[in-house]
Amino acid sequence: MEEFQGYLEKYRSRRQYFLYPLLFQEYIYTIAHGHGLNGSSKIEPVEFFGYDNKSSLVLVKRLITRMYQQNCLVYSINDSNQNRFIGRDLFFYSPLFFQMVSEGFAAIVEIPFSLQLGFSFKEKEIQKYHNLRSIHSIFPFLEDKFSHLNYVSEILIPHPIHTETLVQILQCWVQDVPSLHFLRFFLHKYDNWNSFIIPNKSSYAFSKENKKLFWFFYNSYVFEFEFLVVXLRKQSYYLQSTSFGXFLXRRNFYGKMEHLINVCRNYSQKTLRFFKDPFMHYIRYQGKAILASRDTHILMKKWKCYLVNFWQYYFHFWSYSYRIHINQLKNHSFLLGGYFSSVLINPLAVKNKMLDHSFLIDTVTKKFDTTIPVIPLIGSLSKAKFCTVLGHPNSKTIWADLSDSDIVGRFGRICRNLSHYYSGSSKKQSLYRIKYXXRLSCARTLARKHKRTIRALLQRLGTGFLEEFFTEEEQVLSLIFPKTTIPFPLYGLHRERIWNLDIIRIDDLVNHLDWP
């Protein structure tokens, strides 16, 4: 952040939004290539595929030189000279250029957010990440609230949004006209923008390319949607823009929407007066939102109709009603945050005796339950080439050139992360199949490297060389629960539910499950 202090002071004193000149500064791309504005980002640094750190500075200088040549932009706008332009400056239109500019622009566009929010946090001595909670904090909220609700509406937030709409949304925050014009040109000229803003399931989970700019635009769009439609008391702008890069591991977590009509009196009062419900709850994680209510099915259908019309008239694109599913909680389970969540109903008969008479009282208890989506998780493993679609382990061929310790370490981290994340499940037995596939995949990879059979490899190394990272989670759990609770060291641990509140980013394999 220190690199920007001189420019930011000038920025604040003049009250102008001159961000466009920063596109021609080398240190912008250096910061974008590293950890971002905050200097100590909590996510992995951005990786530029196709070149290493030593040659990155040379490519940045070449990029700035091309951008200084205004003829390149003139040629690119004229379609008749497109062949001449491509033959002359192929680098300017290469995927590498697209990636470098997108990361640099993502770093630049954070400046208005840092000015409006970063300095206020410093003046008020508010912790920077006070609103960034653990992913697992959403599930204790569901345990407390959802057992008393009746209907749930699953909303897949649509994202085939026009690029001009994104620019107009950003215009509320960035008032630098040249930067907005450059953004229009940048988004208009690249045919792969649709694949950039709409990540498919295969490329999203296992590719780090262009994520920072994608998350910035996506969260700006979602903020606009939530601010105008849901009108919650706590809104997304409390998360400063330096957190947009780390937002791939975050989720907006909101509580109860009470007396919605009082908040939105000046906005579509005739429409919103039908939606007053003190027991309506809204939760969003990435591209999926949950609306739950204790009211009737008619209210949920009104919300569904309202959302479809809102996307059509405000964001100017058609959203199909099948993207919103309304179900009863007692008969339905929904996928959120990598878990299948549902409300279990347990009938209970209580015998009550008064003098010479006895009565049987039938009661019903509701319990919020979370299970592991085994089949989708195996599908994620198969797409990552760890196993087949049926769950049979494969060797990870691209890891065969690594050392034995690196291979075992990578498989161990995958298993530990999955065990750590799914510690909140009430049925952990289903996770054993995932561990089995990862364990044999590790053994097959080592056998492929040493050109041996799995049996010969295990005989030489011993069967216990893979046990450490598979049993570490159980050993930790056995230390948490006293022996009075669990008579035997590891007996019944699969029934214990623990929400680890130190999880700040979701595993790629789990993250892959929630995208529509």
UniProtKB/Swiss-Prot annotation:
HAMAP family referenced in this protein's UniProt entry, alphabetically: MatK
Major subcellular site: plastid
Cell location: Plastid, Chloroplast
UniProt-recorded name of the protein: Maturase K
CC per GO annotation: chloroplast
GO molecular function: RNA binding
Family: Belongs to the intron maturase 2 family. MatK subfamily.
Family annotation (InterPro entries): Domain_X (IPR024937), Maturase_MatK (IPR002866), Maturase_MatK_N (IPR024942)
Keywords in alphabetical order: Chloroplast, mRNA processing, Plastid, RNA-binding, tRNA processing
GO BP terms: mRNA processing; RNA splicing; tRNA processing
Free-text function comment from the UniProt entry: Usually encoded in the trnK tRNA gene intron. Probably assists in splicing its own and other chloroplast group II introns.
